[in-house]
Amino acid sequence: MSPSSFPPRINHVAISVDAEVMDEKGRGALLEFYSEVFGWVEGDNSTEQGNPLILYTGSLGQFLYLLPAADEFMVTPNMDHFGIEVSSKEEMQEILDRAKRYQRKDPRVRITDTGAMTTRYQDKEYRLTNAYIWFLIPLWIELQHVELRTDT
């Protein structure tokens, strides 16, 4: 790679979702939940086929692409997921608090307890704090906060 380029990185996740979940009511629930809990916003799908729900997660190049599928949609074992990194444990807790508030009005929301572990990368130890949230799509979302351990 040239010095001015950056390593390839993930910029979106595309998931085929049961079309029954993606009807008008379901799309509204998905948009409301992911907007309220994560702050994601709906993107323009006017040039896309199949009427996907596009949720921008931060910038134009970072999004979740949910495509309605009648026959062949994603089915996953429990806890298959994708992860998002948060800036602090406090931010993670704020997201979890919003998810718990939403869960009170919609019991389909699932949330795991917050966990923590030590992990190693390039001869350094890090503290990884995480929790998982699920709502209507086949994959859970893992929230992660990683910080360098200074107590070792």
Description of each model-found segment:
Residues 15-63:
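Core segments of cupin and vicinal oxygen chelate
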Residues 23-25, 65, 92-94, 143, ...:
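Short acidic, gly/pro-rich beta-turn/loop elements at beta-sheet edges
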Residues 39-43, 71, 117-121:
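Intrinsically disordered, low-complexity segments enriched in polar/charged residues with Gly/Pro
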Residues 17-19, 68-70, 118:
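Short, well-ordered turn and helix-capping elements at secondary-structure junctions
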Residues 43, 49-87, 91:
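A short, hydrophobic/aromatic-rich structural module that often spans a beta strand
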